[in-house]
């Protein structure tokens, strides 16, 4: 189905469905843990592809690995299995564009980013925005940071 216009503030292609998670519990904490691991796996897989000299087209999961994506929110539907649907932004790469380019580690990091031995993830550019939550919630518990 199509998303209502009010949810298209990031892009026309701003949401994706994760594969069915048989082991995910109904609680958001477990879904959050699974989602982080899934994204990390995809991110590492992409880096390996680029390091080998091959190019990789952009899919939804690789888009959220970009440093420009600062917000991600997920909902889930629990029936026989847990289905997870996520919305992310702001919009990063577009379909068909490269995500990573080869080069020296940290050589192309934007201004005001951390990269190197003093950072949590050595070799990855990280924006210093500690006030942004890793995952945000929309209307599940009465507290929301969605607009």
UniProtKB/Swiss-Prot annotation:
Expressed by the venom gland. One of its GO terms (cellular component) is extracellular region. Gene3D superfamilies: CAP. Keywords: Allergen, Secreted. It comes from Phoneutria keyserlingi (Brazilian wandering spider). This is CRISP-1. It is found in: Secreted. Belongs to the CRISP family. It comes from the Eukaryota. The keyword Secreted applies. SUPFAM superfamilies: PR-1-like.
């Amino acid at each position: 189905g199509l998303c209502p216009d009010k949810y298209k503030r990031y892009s026309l292609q701003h949401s994706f469905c994760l594969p069915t998670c048989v082991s995910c519990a109904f609680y958001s904490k477990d879904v959050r843990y699974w989602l982080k691991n899934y994204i990390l796996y995809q991110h590492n897989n992409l880096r390996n592809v680029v390091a080998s000299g091959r190019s990789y087209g952009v899919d939804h999961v690789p888009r959220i690995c970009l440093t420009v994506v600062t917000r991600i929110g997920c909902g889930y539907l629990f029936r026989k299995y847990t289905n997870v649907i996520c919305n992310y932004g702001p919009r990063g790469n577009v379909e068909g564009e490269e995500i990573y380019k080869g080069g020296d580690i940290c050589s192309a990091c934007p201004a005001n980013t951390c990269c190197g031995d003093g950072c949590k993830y050595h070799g990855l550019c990280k924006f210093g925005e500690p006030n942004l939550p890793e995952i945000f919630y929309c209307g599940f518990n009465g507290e929301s940071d969605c607009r």
